[in-house]
């Protein structure tokens, strides 16, 4: 993640927010509408505990801005914030809107086996543009 810079688009997402210390990418995979990954763009760290208090405060404020914007645009019943890092050791947070009709309400979100299909392009573009405006 450090080496990729701060692109507007990647193979896996469209950037909807470029903050002081983070970028947020709306995911192309059709896992859940609004699924976004917020990536720490300061010095390389793998865990949030490696951030200074000031860095942590700035990251969380930007992360909350993304979450609030997803809530305002999509109206989920809940938003999950997941810091994993098992397969990619760079600080990033999965922001997963949850809806009343999602596959497992009240439980962790079930990720599909294998590569999920892409999100419908027109809906992805419309959501990305709306979220950028709201940021």
Predicted segments with their positions:
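HIT superfamily nucleotide-processing domains
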Residues: 1-135
């Amino acid at each position: 993640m450090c080496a990729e810079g701060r692109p507007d688009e990647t193979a896996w997402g469209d950037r909807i927010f470029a903050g002081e210390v983070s970028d947020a990418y709306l995911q192309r995979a059709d896992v859940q509408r609004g699924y976004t990954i917020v990536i720490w763009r300061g010095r390389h760290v793998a865990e949030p505990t490696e951030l200074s208090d000031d860095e942590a405060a700035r990251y969380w404020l930007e992360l909350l801005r993304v979450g609030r914007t997803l809530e305002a645009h999509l109206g989920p019943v809940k938003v999950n914030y997941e810091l994993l890092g098992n397969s990619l050791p760079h600080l990033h947070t999965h922001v997963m809107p949850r809806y009343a009709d999602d596959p497992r309400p009240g439980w962790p979100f079930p990720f599909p086996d294998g590569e999920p299909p892409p999100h419908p392009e027109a809906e992805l573009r419309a959501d990305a543009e709306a979220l950028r405006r709201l940021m």
